[in-house]
Amino acid sequence: MSLPPVIAIDGPTASGKGTVASLVAEKLGFHYLDSGALYRLVALASEKQGIDVKNGQELGLLVPKLLISFKNSQIFLNGENVTDAIRVESIGLRASALAVHPEIRSALVGLQRSFRQSPGLVADGRDTASVIFPDAILKVFLTATAAARAGRRYKQLIAKGISAKLEDLLQDLQERDARDSSRGVAPLLVADGAKVLETSDLSIDQAVKTVLDWY
């Protein structure tokens, strides 16, 4: 029996891949996996437990102990709604730092693959197109300039009532891009066979339509 189809969407931080992926899933009636949220959940849980972000072994052992669930666009960790808590910049930076550990990536592989259910799945995040779902029917690398991404993130934070400085966000994104692209484990790169979608000058609706047309 053939496995349900997967659309895998990757790209740099704040490229809009999560928004596009969730809307594509909604249009197709597919399940949705935000793999980046899983790393943010590990970041939040490890911070609460005081685990050093450099301790890959201890972080890897933490993953199986976490009770994670996605319900109606809300994300729960051990029964607590942490949808907003995992989106703050400090947790994003911590998630990027701990994602370099192979122990964590290995621990999350099985969890991510469990989301592959009928009628299909749209998965966004690092590794989805190369390691987690190498047989994805469509692989998309969604990108935009650092300036465009910083501007989008700034608007998102301000809309949520969170104070932010555009220049600080731009610097953080540039540093994360450099770290994500150069790390030895799962670096940021275009997967074999992936289509590149540059969204600096595209609206969300235009990006979603492009992905649907490719599918």
Curated annotation (Swiss-Prot):
Gene Ontology molecular-function annotations: ATP binding; CMP kinase activity; dCMP kinase activity
Subcellular location, principal: cytoplasm
Keywords: ATP-binding, Cytoplasm, Kinase, Nucleotide-binding, Transferase
EC number: 2.7.4.25
Compartments reported by the entry: Cytoplasm
Family: Belongs to the cytidylate kinase family. Type 1 subfamily.
Name this protein carries in UniProt: Cytidylate kinase
Species per Swiss-Prot/TrEMBL record: Polynucleobacter necessarius subsp. necessarius (strain STIR1)
